[in-house]
């Protein structure tokens, strides 16, 4: 299994404490420290780091994974959401440590590209009702929001299988039963992914 480094910075330096840390003195508990962990991808070590919320991710050294589901913003982006990219980088490094390769084969798409893919799917599947099971139109898809990844679609499926098994740690979830390659940041890192939907036509 991959390793998660947990760090707590105290006033005097760094202590290796868990999220519910206990300080002991002469074998007696004198104080219990509780903190909400912040998930960060530490670029120098290529490891997932849990830092205390009051410290946060280190600017220039960490990529923050965010503390909740990543939702659409108010303006259309032109690239993948940075926190989604940080989540993938963190998972990718953990998978690499186990000898598994993960690749983003498709991520951000413009509205025009997404609508083109939907129209192409209609021609392939004969009706919009069938096409939408595989490709959503631009106004419904999360690809144009920079919030969806197609992982290892054109490569070894083992990378996507690894991410399905371990992605919740990084806040990444497989979404559809009929698309083993499609992942979205549906939960906070360390949460529980929702049940798979049969296909995209069941999207609410």
Residue locations for each model-derived region?
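Extracytoplasmic cell-surface/polysaccharide-interacting catalytic and binding patches
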Residues: 2-107, 111-204
């Amino acid at each position: 299994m991959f390793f998660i480094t947990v760090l707590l910075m105290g006033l005097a330096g760094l202590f290796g404490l868990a999220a519910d840390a206990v300080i002991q003195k002469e074998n007696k508990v004198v104080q219990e420290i509780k903190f909400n962990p912040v998930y960060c991808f530490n670029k120098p070590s290529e490891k997932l780091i849990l830092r205390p919320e009051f410290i946060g991710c280190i600017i220039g050294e960490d990529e923050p994974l965010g503390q909740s589901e990543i939702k659409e913003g108010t303006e259309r982006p032109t690239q993948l959401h940075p926190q989604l990219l940080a989540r993938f980088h963190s998972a990718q490094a953990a998978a690499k440590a186990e000898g598994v390769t993960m690749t983003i084969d498709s991520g951000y798409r413009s509205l025009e590209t997404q609508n083109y893919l939907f129209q192409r799917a209609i021609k392939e599947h004969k009706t919009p009702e069938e096409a939408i099971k595989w490709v959503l139109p631009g106004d419904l898809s999360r690809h144009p929001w920079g919030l969806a990844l197609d992982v290892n679609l054109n490569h070894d499926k083992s990378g996507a299988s690894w991410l399905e098994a371990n992605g919740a740690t990084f806040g990444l979830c497989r979404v559809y039963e009929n698309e083993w390659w499609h992942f979205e940041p549906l939960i906070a890192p360390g949460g529980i992914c929702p049940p798979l939907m049969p296909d995209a036509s069941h999207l609410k």
